[in-house]
UniProtKB/Swiss-Prot annotation:
It comes from Rhizobium meliloti (strain 1021). This is Urease accessory protein UreE. The keyword Cytoplasm applies. The keyword ATP-binding does not apply. GO terms for biological process: protein folding; protein-containing complex assembly; urea metabolic process. Belongs to the UreE family. SMART domains: UreE_N. The lineage of its organism: Bacteria, Pseudomonadati, Pseudomonadota, Alphaproteobacteria, Hyphomicrobiales. Keywords: Chaperone, Cytoplasm, Nickel, Nickel insertion. GO terms for cellular component: cytoplasm.
Length: 154
């Protein structure tokens, strides 16, 4: 059954169960107009006014009622650890200087795998491990969130 969506919401308390779930990578979650294929072979025509970066848990509101939940796919990432908090800030600076998408968490940074960057980080004294996790990088200083109506965004 084909669906159409022109609106994205962040979930609020007491949301109903979604009709379907759609698992997308970080790169796939940045979109505006696209035909999305669900696991059951149904399709959703997403047609938004502006490009958005969908977050894990966002809801595609379907014309005619219901919604589809967006899930962040596990991706091949590097888990970067530092000797101390100052060293972690230095590593983050080097990654930011290269304009790399990065998820900064307490005690670690996550980035997409790149052997050249891994060698640089290890040369700077970082511990770099390969992990497979959903990727939620920080938005840049010039990023504008494209959601119209929403309850929360974390």
């Amino acid at each position: 059954m084909p669906y159409r969506s022109t609106e994205v919401l962040s979930p609020g308390p007491g949301e109903r169960a979604p009709l379907h779930r759609l698992t997308l990578t970080h790169e796939q979650r940045h979109l505006r107009r696209k035909l999305l294929h669900l696991e059951n072979d149904d399709v959703v025509m997403l047609d938004l006014k502006e490009p958005v970066m969908l977050a894990d848990g966002d809801l595609l509101v379907l014309e005619g009622g219901g919604h589809i939940e967006v899930k962040a796919a596990a991706e091949a990432l590097y888990d970067i650890r530092a000797r101390n908090p100052l060293h972690l800030m230095e590593l983050a600076w080097h990654l930011g200087n290269r304009h790399l998408p990065a998820a900064v968490e307490e005690g670690r940074i996550l980035i997409a795998r790149d052997p050249v960057i891994r060698a640089m980080l290890e040369g700077l004294g970082a511990t770099v491990d390969e992990v497979n996790e959903p990727f939620h990088p920080l938005h840049g200083a010039y990023h504008q969130h494209g959601h119209g109506d929403h309850y929360r965004h974390g």
